[in-house]
Amino acid sequence: ADNPDNFLDLSVQGELKSGDFYIDGGVSSQFISGLLFALPLLQGDSRIFIEGNLQSSGYLDLTLCALKNYGIDVQKEGNVLYVKGNQRYLNHDSYIEGDYSQAAFFEVANYLGSGVDIIGLNKESLQGDKVITEFLQQLKDASPDETLIFDGGNCPDIIPVFALAC
């Protein structure tokens, strides 16, 4: 009743402090990636403990690669990430490669008979979603009565659109 615009009144206050962070790896790698971008800028060292099985590990690999490219040192030992504090991001020109998550829509459209030219994708990319090309090739190569099993644990973003091809 106090909020005629139907917006949630939410205020988050406080300061992110370095230290130990325990993150459930089965929920989303985005929480880990977010911490990895922020923690190097803090005063002290930090550790991220990934509990359970890490889903979407390919996305975490992309984050670690991006951090390295911009001069941030993160060490990974097992399920623990070590992040030194007081680091600075390096400024340099970068090429942003094509996004396999978005390209998956066009890859599936082509599989279903469209003729879309897809350019700008790095075939050597670390993106887990590039597996869409392998998944679609397996569908093409399969016999009509063959049962196929696809593991989308490391590429959950493409599974809904991939389902259209099945």
What residue spans do the PLM features occupy?
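Structural preference for solvent-exposed beta-strand-turn elements
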Residues: 1-166
